Amino acid sequence: MAKKSNKSNKLSTLQKPSQKDFILTIDSDSEGENEIPDLEEESEVDQELKEEEKPKPKPKPKSKKNKKNKDINNDQEKTEEQEEINPNFTFSLDGFETSTAFDGWDFKVESNGDVTKKPISKDVDLDGILRRKGGLANLAGSDVKVDEKNDEVESEEVEEVEEDDEDEENEQEGDDDDDELALDGFGMSATEASANADDDQDEQEPEDDDEGVEADMDEEYPGSDQEDEKPVEDTAEDMAEFYADEEEATTAKKQLHTTFQSLQLSRPVLKGLSQLGYTKPSPIQSACIPIALLGKDIVAGAVTGSGKTAAYMIPIIERLLYKPAKISSTRVIVLAPTRELAIQVCDVGKKIGQFVNNLNFGLAVGGLNLRQQEQQLKTRPDIVIATPGRLIDHIRNSPSFSIDSLEVLVIDEADRMLDEGFQAELTEILSLIPRHKRQTLLYSATMNTKIQDLIQLSLQKPVRVMIDPPKSAAIKLVQEFVRIRKRDHLKPALLFQLIKSVDPSQQNRIVVFVARKESAHKLRIILGLLGMRVSELHGSLTQEQRLASVNDFKNLTVPVLICTDLAARGLDIPKIEIVINYDMPKTHEIYLHRVGRTARAGREGKSITFVGESTQDRAIVKDAIKSISEEQARNSKQGKAVSRNVDWKEVEELNKIVESKATVIEEVLDEEKQAKEMLHAEMELSKATNMIKHEKEIQSRPRRTWFESEKDKKHQTEVMQQLTKHGKKVNSHKRKAIEVKKENSSRSYKKTKQDRMSVQKKPKSNGKNKK
């Protein structure tokens, strides 16, 4: 019996694997899956996964009901797929404007380089000095009954400033949501109110048309038409030889893409654009993106605020989707003239490519921590946004940073980068960058650069895409001009009167451009003593102060920003309503970049310019009116130029208040100077202690090299080049002699020191030989 039981067990064991090894065929699958027993125990997770993976049973008889059920299931699957493909797309009819959820680009440095959280150096508390002197409290020249609300707003702002001085870090981290709500409210509901306010101002202030402004300027500055000089333009033959065929550019302009999907971009890029609220490409974007994706060189120009940064950043990110995954190298370099513009471009790229895997950005700008940038560049990021000087420094002195595998070079604000100020640095960068198989993209709002300047870039038949004329302002910009005549001393009071007339409940951002850094600082002190919160932005500030000023202005903690031409190019701070030219710029191109800070991306804006008596000021006004009249002939929606009338009696009364505070202004400047000297002494003391403690480590570091010596730096400017010969300084006498030799004219002989000495050494006669 035992033997029989063993045999039966063996048979059962032989039968079990035969059932396990049973393989399903297509026919058996259709017969039914439930007939096959599951002999192994499964976990709940495996059962759920298998239930999801199980195909639905297909019955043999085909009926109409089953067909209907299949159609319903297919429709459900299609809707699910569409939801998965486009989860965050929002369609609007506002062109290429950003949605209300997007509040502009960030001007902060990430991770270890976050200078907003850990300031490297201490700064002088100028607002504290102004409060001790009686400023930043009550707005000068305002009635208490009328402006009770304004005084309440100002008192709240003063309390916020005191809290900011106690804890800057908590303010920057905790108030972001409140600022977003304020900006969203302004963007959604305040447009009609601001338009009505503008209409009320227009009714109160009589304005002249373009012809009236031009006639007034002609009366004030007669005979200046003869001084206008026409610039030398490139011939048609030279342009045909240098640029690609014009048909390619014209066809690109005609192809107006209504959506970004028609540009055949990848899904991660489209998702990033939808996250920013971009639905319709701008004309410069629809024209340049297809050409850039083909790998061709581009020389492009469009008005300010037309989306030029995204026009070159979108095809770059699309191209980097197909890079080798295992090889990390820097493939793209973007050059920008200012640090703030480079930080903004870096944020634009990060937000467009936020859904792209393995896409890294690097930032190399001056004023920030050099060692942290070296550590970031060691990882060899795909895209490096840099200013020219710091890029050369890293190429020469950072050991693990190389640009041998560079594929794309972008020069933003190309006309400024090709000027003589960046000439030496740009030629050095071009000598270090490989020329073979390099794509070069040039973008600017005033791209009127000559071919002679572009030859050094070694472009390969670039496509010239000019969406707008090189000297044209935005369509919805209203340009106002105030004739100062002989009232230059009233300009600070006039500026205060204009800013005070703006309704504070509208949360307007106002940018004031000045010519000199000293005047920007002094205006901040004057307006602060008059009770107005103002920030400044210029080259004398540290990089931490510059970024803090931009962030405070962006977050509306400070509504007025006084700056030099440092902020005239590229900065895209949303909802800047008014630009005031306190000092006239040197050229019409700089004027266009200044007024281009407002009326961006199809919005409305206003510029107010103080016009002096010089012929240069009059020429800029004439060019502005001329460009408007030319555009009005082409496009009826073009902006207008008007002459603004001012109540000079009120300005003179305000000027008396300003003059009464002259001694206080000097006291503030002296106190600030003493505080700066104390901080400088503390810095020198800490520097000396570090030199004593870490002497060996500091001396062991290799010296950083530069492509120019100190003497070469001094002889860079035009004036020094004219006054020098072969690197040596030439005095006035030698320079005059050289000029005379060039003119081939005779010059009267002048006794030298040797001649005078030889006359003195001659012996005097004793008179013996006299008869």
From Swiss-Prot:
GO terms for molecular function: ATP binding; ATP hydrolysis activity; RNA binding; RNA helicase activity. Its EC number is 3.6.4.13. Pfam families: DEAD, Helicase_C. SUPFAM superfamilies: P-loop containing nucleoside triphosphate hydrolases (SSF52540). SMART domains: DEXDc (SM00487), HELICc (SM00490). One of its GO terms (biological process) is rRNA processing. A motif (DEAD box) lies at residues 412-415. Residues 289-465 form the Helicase ATP-binding domain. GO terms for cellular component: cytosol; nucleolus. Residues 57-68, 725-736, 759-771 have a biased composition (Basic residues). Residues 33-84 form a coiled coil. It catalyses: ATP + H2O = ADP + phosphate + H(+). Gene3D superfamilies: P-loop containing nucleotide triphosphate hydrolases. Residues 476-643 form the Helicase C-terminal domain. A motif (Q motif) lies at residues 258-286. Residues 47-56, 69-79, 695-717 have a biased composition (Basic and acidic residues). Signal peptide: none annotated. It is found in: Nucleus, Nucleolus. Keywords: ATP-binding, Coiled coil, Helicase, Hydrolase, Nucleotide-binding, Nucleus, Ribosome biogenesis, RNA-binding. Associates with pre-ribosomal particles. The Q motif is unique to and characteristic of the DEAD box family of RNA helicases and controls ATP binding and hydrolysis. This is ATP-dependent RNA helicase DRS1. It comes from Debaryomyces hansenii (strain ATCC 36239 / CBS 767 / BCRC 21394 / JCM 1990 / NBRC 0083 / IGC 2968). The gene is DRS1.
